[in-house]
């Protein structure tokens, strides 16, 4: 920008110096122009480009003439400049060939003077147009630095700036004739937020009613007051600005930004769109006294507020419809509250100019009042009334974020209209107790899920009144309804008379018992005849038919041979079973012996001596394994039964040594043949004495071999034995420290964000009811009195929530009016409610009259420590209470 300004100053100085030379040079230029019959090629080219057809569509209908002339002048100007450059190039080429002629040099100087004259006229016309259009930046320097293609950019800039000319302040600033260079530095392209905020500034009522300032300082303070965005310490305003610039698509992030809004220091409220910064508020509140709305009534009675400079803040809860006074002037009434004590409201009256300037203020706006004038309320009303005599004594600070209505419903089903502070609790003082009981009735772990209740109607068995009232029964006097109903039904039921007969006295036999059982089970006594289809099926040669026929034949044979029922004692049954087992064992042993003798007699060798034959013919031992044929495959047997053949007896307490394994017949024959060969050679085999327990000593060679094996086995050191385990351990540790394993450990699921969101939702669903319950408890503890509707019987002289039936029936003098219900507690823990300032009776529990104000909810007490429950003197009795004094 500075370079452009320097070029502009240099150009104007050159124009002023050549003003004296221009008249004479103009005549020469005319003669030269008339003398030259042939026009220049570049003049025609730039004249064609200077028509401005491509930009006439954007220009307005009223400015088409001016725009066309301006474009023609600019095109002519730039076309001549191009001619100059082309002439310079041509002269340079001629200079290379030979010295340039003098007429061409004179023509170049004359053209330069002509162009300077045209440039001067063009600059004057541009300055007039820029002044008329109220444009700050002169575009005259742009053609000197930009190429010919951008010659029409000043026109575009001019049109773009004309669209913003909507504000009077903005046009007034543009009308300044001369601006210093320091001001030109600030002319930068503005952001949309800054431009919009600047355009909105004159329309905001904040400047109309500037905060708590004298009229002579209002203008200066308005100009010197920094904007809320410029204040670095204004966190509240900065947060709100970010909130306002959120795009519509990001509306889901709005609650997070709202939670970051800070509380205004003086009013104690959270503001949605603050209009005054925190530093500005601290400057305005300097030297002034802050009085809360609930304290105004007390301060008016004890202090002289007219002599003090005081300020109060409140929220517009309700606006009464503007009314007309007796003098004909219109006034309005606002109901104000600070949202901390919703029971006390203040009425603000607006008259005259105050009403004209502020009657459009919306409900829910936070305002500040400076030195409000007190007014006398109507007869019978105790409400505080204030008025303002000047609009500048009202400061509009923003919108109350926590102002809302109760979320409960009335008994008639309509929504409650009571005002609540959403930051403290969502329910008013009339519905909070019922909502707290409803929330406490459910289990905390099942706040957001189904926690029992009645069965849906479509699944109910009955819908009678008794079933609806007594679904699960009830208890009265320690007896359940079900047991009482059963006992009563048994008592009421008539007793059947049983006639004593001979059949009842005599013990019935088995046949009669069977017949009675069949009758109870519904079994027919007579056998049913078979159908023809069943007979045809039984006649077919199938496996099922044959098996059924065999089964029926066996059943008939067993039924005919044995009686259906046998009576036998336990001892006889045991003896019978024992005898049967012995007979079975005897049969098995005989069969085994016969089979063994037959197999041994068949396979006998002629070379075997008589002694061996006699030994083979002897009876085997109990549990011996008998030989089997080689061709037969022996089935697999369990390990516990190894060495025992099928059908043998198992003796668990037999101390005899195990029998030698028996060889097969072929192996036995081979063994006998080998023994015969050894004897033929003269070798005598000594028999081993089975009763000899002394071991035979080993030879020296065998002993040496055993020692060598033992030494070889002991040469392995314990370190060598532990080496494989250590190596394996090192490999495992190396793998744990490897990059691959660390990568596996650090690997995370791509659904981690979804899991975190689900956990956050679960935590939110779990903690939200607890937070609401805690808010209710805090509000109920802080609520010490509640306004209510009471009745006073002037005949009986009592005041209560509802009249007695006798007073209504006898038509006593009843007077309904507003009352206050107060909560009290006794040091012993007993609580009571009173419609008077103090209860009229003593405590029912301890008999003392030491009532203290308490909240709506009884304070919860946790477990007591040992020092609180310790009684060093023991439990005090009534007759020793005087010793404590």
UniProtKB/Swiss-Prot annotation:
Pfam families: Mcm10, MCM10_OB, zf-CCCH_Mcm10, zf-primase. GO terms for cellular component: nucleolus; nucleoplasm; nucleus. It comes from the Eukaryota. Residues 218-228, 603-621 have a biased composition (Low complexity). The keyword DNA damage applies. Residues 1-153 are annotated as: N-terminal domain. Residues 193-217, 236-260 have a biased composition (Polar residues). The modification Phosphothreonine is found at residue 85. SMART domains: Mcm10 (SM01280). Residues 251-405 are annotated as: OB-fold domain. Residues 181-190 have a biased composition (Basic residues). GO terms for molecular function: double-stranded DNA binding; enzyme binding; identical protein binding; single-stranded DNA binding; zinc ion binding. This is Protein MCM10 homolog. Residues 23-260, 579-642 are annotated as: Disordered. Self-associates. Interacts with ORC2. May interact with MCM2 and MCM6. Interacts with the DNA polymerase alpha subunit POLA1. Interacts with RECQL4; this interaction regulates RECQL4 unwinding activity. Interacts with WDHD1. Residues 101-139 form a coiled coil. There is a cross-link at residues 639, 772-773 (Glycyl lysine isopeptide (Lys-Gly) (interchain with G-Cter in SUMO2)). GO terms for biological process: cell population proliferation; DNA damage response; DNA replication initiation. The modification Phosphoserine is found at residue 656. Residues 406-431 are annotated as: Zinc finger-like 1. It is found in: Nucleus.
């Amino acid at each position: 920008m500075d370079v452009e300004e320097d070029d502009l100053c240099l150009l104007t100085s050159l124009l002023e110096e050549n003003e004296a030379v221009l008249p004479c040079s103009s005549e020469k230029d005319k003669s030269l122009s008339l003398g030259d019959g042939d026009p220049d090629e570049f003049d025609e080219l730039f004249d064609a480009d200077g028509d401005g057809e491509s930009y006439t569509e954007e220009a307005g209908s009223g400015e088409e003439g001016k725009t066309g002339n301006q474009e023609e002048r600019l095109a002519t100007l730039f076309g001549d400049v191009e001619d100059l450059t082309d002439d310079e190039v041509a002269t340079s080429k001629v200079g290379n060939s030979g010295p340039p002629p003098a007429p061409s040099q004179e023509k170049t100087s004359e053209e330069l003077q002509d162009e300077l004259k045209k440039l001067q006229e063009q600059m004057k016309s541009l300055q007039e147009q820029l002044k008329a259009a109220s444009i700050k930046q002169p575009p005259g320097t742009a053609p000197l630095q930009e190429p010919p293609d951008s010659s029409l950019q000043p026109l575009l800039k001019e049109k773009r700036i004309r669209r913003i000319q909507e504000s009077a302040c903005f046009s007034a600033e543009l009308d300044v004739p001369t601006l210093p260079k320091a001001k030109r530095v600030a002319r930068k392209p503005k952001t949309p937020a800054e431009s919009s905020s600047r355009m909105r500034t004159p329309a905001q009522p904040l400047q109309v009613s500037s905060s708590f300032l004298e009229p002579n300082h209002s203008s200066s303070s308005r100009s010197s007051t920094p904007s809320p965005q410029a204040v670095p310490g204004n966190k509240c305003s900065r947060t709100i600005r970010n909130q306002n610039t959120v795009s519509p698509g990001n509306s889901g992030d709005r609650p997070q930004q709202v939670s970051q809004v800070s509380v205004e220091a003086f009013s104690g409220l959270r503001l949605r769109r603050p209009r005054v910064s925190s530093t500005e508020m601290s400057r305005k509140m300097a030297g002034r006294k802050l009085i809360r709305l609930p304290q105004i009534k007390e301060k008016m009675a004890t202090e002289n507020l007219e002599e003090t400079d005081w300020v109060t803040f409140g929220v517009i809860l309700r606006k009464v419809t503007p009314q007309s006074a007796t003098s004909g002037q219109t006034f309005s009434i606002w109901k104000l509250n600070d949202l901390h004590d919703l029971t006390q409201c203040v009425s603000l009256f607006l008259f005259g100019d105050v009403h004209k300037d502020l009657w459009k203020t919306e409900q829910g706006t936070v305002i500040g009042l400076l030195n409000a004038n007190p007014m006398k309320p109507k007869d019978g009303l105790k409400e505080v009334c204030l008025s303002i005599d000047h609009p500048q004594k009202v400061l509009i600070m923003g919108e109350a974020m926590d102002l809302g209505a109760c979320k409960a419903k009335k008994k008639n089903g309509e929504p409650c209209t009571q005002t609540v502070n959403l930051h403290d609790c969502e329910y008013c003082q009339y519905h909070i107790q019922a909502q707290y009981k409803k929330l406490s009735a459910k289990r905390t772990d099942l706040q957001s899920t189904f926690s029992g209740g009645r069965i849906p109607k479509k699944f109910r068995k009955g819908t009678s009144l008794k079933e609806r009232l007594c679904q699960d029964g009830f208890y009265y006097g320690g007896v359940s309804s079900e047991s009482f109903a059963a006992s009563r039904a048994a008592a009421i039921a008539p007793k059947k008379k049983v006639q004593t007969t001979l059949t009842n006295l005599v013990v019935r036999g088995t046949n009669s018992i069977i017949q009675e059982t069949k009758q109870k089970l519904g079994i027919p006594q007579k056998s049913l005849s078979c159908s023809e289809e069943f007979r045809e099926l039984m006649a077919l040669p199938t496996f099922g038919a044959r098996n059924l026929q065999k089964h029926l034949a066996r059943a008939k044979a067993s039924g005919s041979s044995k009686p259906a029922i046998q009576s036998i004692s336990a001892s006889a049954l045991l003896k019978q079973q024992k005898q049967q087992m012995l007979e079975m064992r005897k049969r098995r042993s005989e069969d085994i012996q016969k089979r063994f003798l037959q197999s041994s007699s068949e396979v006998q060798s002629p070379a075997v001596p008589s002694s061996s034959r006699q030994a083979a013919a002897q009876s085997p031992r109990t549990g011996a394994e008998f030989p089997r044929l080689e061709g037969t495959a022996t089935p697999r047997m369990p390990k516990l039964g190894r060495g025992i053949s099928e059908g043998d007896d198992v003796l668990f307490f037999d101390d005899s040594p195990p029998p030698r394994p028996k060889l097969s017949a072929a192996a036995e024959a081979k063994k006998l043949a080998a023994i015969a060969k050894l004897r033929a050679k003269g070798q005598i085999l000594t028999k081993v004495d089975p009763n000899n327990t002394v071991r035979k000593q080993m030879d020296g060679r065998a002993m040496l071999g055993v020692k060598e094996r033992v030494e070889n086995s002991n040469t392995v050191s314990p370190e060598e034995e532990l080496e494989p385990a250590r190596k394996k351990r090192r490999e495992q540790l190396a793998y744990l420290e490897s990059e691959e394993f660390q990568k596996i450990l650090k690997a995370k699921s791509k659904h981690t964000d979804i899991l975190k969101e689900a956990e956050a939702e679960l935590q939110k669903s779990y903690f939200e009811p607890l937070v609401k319950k805690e808010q209710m408890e805090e509000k109920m503890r802080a609520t010490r009195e509640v306004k209510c509707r009471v009745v006073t019987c002037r005949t009986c002289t009592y005041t209560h929530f509802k009249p007695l039936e006798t007073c209504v029936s006898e038509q006593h003098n009843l007077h309904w009016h507003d009352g206050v219900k107060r909560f009290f507690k006794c040091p012993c823990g007993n609580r009571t409610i009173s419609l008077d300032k103090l209860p009229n009776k003593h405590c029912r529990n301890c008999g003392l009259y030491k009532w203290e104000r308490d909240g709506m909810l009884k304070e919860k007490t946790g477990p007591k420590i040992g020092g609180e429950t310790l009684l060093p003197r023991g439990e005090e009795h009534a007759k020793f209470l005087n010793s404590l004094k």
